[in-house]
Amino acid sequence: MTPDDRPSLDLDGSLDPFGTNAGTHSALPGGHESAEGGVEYSTGTTTVGIVAADGVVLATDRRASLGGQFVSNKSVVKVEQVHPTAAVTIAGTVGAAQAYLKQLRAEADLYENRRGSRMSMEALSTVGSAILRGLPVSPLLGGVDPTGADENGAGEPHLYQLDGAGGRIEESAYAATGSGMTVATGALEREYDPDADVEVAVPTAVDAVLAASERDTASGNGVVVARVTGDGVETELRDATGAHMGGAAGGVR
């Protein structure tokens, strides 16, 4: 069976917390059945990542949609912590995203229990890309090497683009994915400061997502932003103007 023949993990709606299964394929942000009866997956959303001097900033919009045509949820949290010093942004099908996050967390725990040491970002990204193969999920993985990792460089920030073919690319500055990535990349190109710390990089990430939301119909309804440092992952919500709304809990679990 090829990845294209693989049935959705969410066909019965049991992994659809947004209640959007209504004859079409529920997705973060969208997917639909093709004329041939197969499932086509889109990556309509906006996710961005920025490498800062002391960590990584991840940000996404909050909209879930069906094929970018119908807004099915306006308060989705698309950034998830997967390790004490790492988080993932998610674009793709809800069921597959949930399964991917659970497996990645389990693999990280198993790795550390077997080796008796903390998992480096290099190792986490390798595992993350391997288990993603064939899944309709498009993540950014950002994190900081923890103290006690196998490799040297504790405190070093890393940002990776992962793809469904098992690919893995480390970004040295910033990255954007999803249907709003063109506008977001332009905003990042204009505002990115290579010497900025996490606090300075947060507004840049938020501005990039908001800029994309102005033009991309599959993105919008505010921003989820995560600060990832050696001290952990701190997630917060911003409204459609970028104003702070408090901490974020839950998401694509």
Model regions and ranges:
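Contiguous domain-boundary segments centered on the initiation and propagation of an alpha-helix
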Residues: T2-T43, H83, T89-A165, A240-G242, ...
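A short, polar/proline- and glycine-enriched secondary-structure boundary/capping micro-motif
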Residues: G67-N73, Q98-K102, E170-A173, M245-G250
